[in-house]
Amino acid sequence: MKKTHINVIGAGLAGSEAAYQIAKRGIPVKLYEMRGVKQTPQHKTDKFAELVCSNSLRGAAITNAVGLLKEEMRRLDSVIIKAAEVTQVPAGGALAVDREGFSDFVTREVSNHPLVEVIREEITDLPEDEITIIATGPLTSDKLAEKIHEFNGADGFYFYDAAAPIIDANSINFDKVYKKSRYDKGEADYINCPMTKEEFQAFQEALISAEEAPLNSFEDLKVFEGCMPIEEMAKRGYKTMLFGPMKPVGLEYPEDYKGPRDGDFKTPYAVVQLRQDNASASLYNIVGFQTHLKWGEQKRVFQMIPGLENAEFVRYGVMHRNSYMDSPNLLKQTFQSRKQENLFFAGQMTGVEGYVESAASGLVAGINAVKLFNDEEVVIFPKTTAIGSLPYYITHTDSKHFQPMNVTFGIVEELEGPRIRDKKERYTKVAERALNSLTDIISKDNL
């Protein structure tokens, strides 16, 4: 393996952060960016870290998971967080930035570094004998996407995501639901939310009339035909959902069920199933409920489901074009390929969702690329931190149901001892523990 420099492909949020982290540790970087030579359908400029959608980096307080992640990144000298603080604009409790000023700052800080060589060209193959970070984003060029697809195997690369909402298990009303697998096959792994005929009719009407999120210009709903949105099913006919994700067959009421039901029927009229989403069973996703509804509408409509009246949504459902990998099978927590240790992946293509999360993955990949370059032990950030919980989640969740994920407190390791009921107090304790853990690892691994 050649060790004269480290390659970073893509100068978005993840790639820019990775290049900065590598260069500041004294290692030469070749940063490849095709914009300026070849444009994507999404970007408007050739600047680094261009924010193509919102100009918000979301919540600022450390009692918010993304706020905690930003504080951890700040302590690790993130160029993305530095840029955000310098170009911040008023936005209440959120961290929003001047879009052009933000990209200008990152472009200047990274490209002016004496150890960074910026090369404007399209990369169409994966380097075999050099340490390389691939951070080409959700609209990776077709040629490189095909190479990544070949490298990872036929089932290892997806071209869109259709994610169902995920809810906090502690917000489920267990008086109205029951655990059971269809036809009692295997363990009772599913939480079932039964509906009466009247409840189902009201739910279907709400779905049909709910407002959908607008599509971006580069997206085409035809790609979603193999994974139909729940609201589209509702529009296709009264019984479409009853023969799809809400079919009740094999899900009879248990004998001790005391919730509402239609007369003496042994089986509900319709059932919404919740499937465990993480090993600790603190998160559940709504099975088959991929959706394109606006987030506010998702909350309004899905809280009509019995047992979910007070559901806390850890992640709302999304449907959009998004090239991403089967990270549970393909990546290590260090963002290294399991197949080829000198190859790292970072950004949205790894299954992290959001500006800050993408930059965080680049930060971790950059640090570990340097560790590999220097023949040092790579760093695994603890699950007690936000920056450690995200790579753990995307590399340890069930591959069959893997979908891109934002950072949330639901994926951070829970506090020991009795659960603190007051949410703000609980999240404050989680944040304090995270920052203490980070201080320890910064010292231990000389970060």
Curated annotation (Swiss-Prot):
Cofactors named for this entry: FAD
Enzyme class: transferase
GO biological process entries: tRNA methylation; tRNA wobble uridine modification
Source superkingdom: Bacteria
Residues involved in FAD binding: 10-15
Keywords annotated in UniProt: Cytoplasm, FAD, Flavoprotein, Methyltransferase, NAD, NADP, Transferase, tRNA processing
Protein's UniProt name: Methylenetetrahydrofolate--tRNA-(uracil-5-)-methyltransferase TrmFO
Gene (name only): trmFO
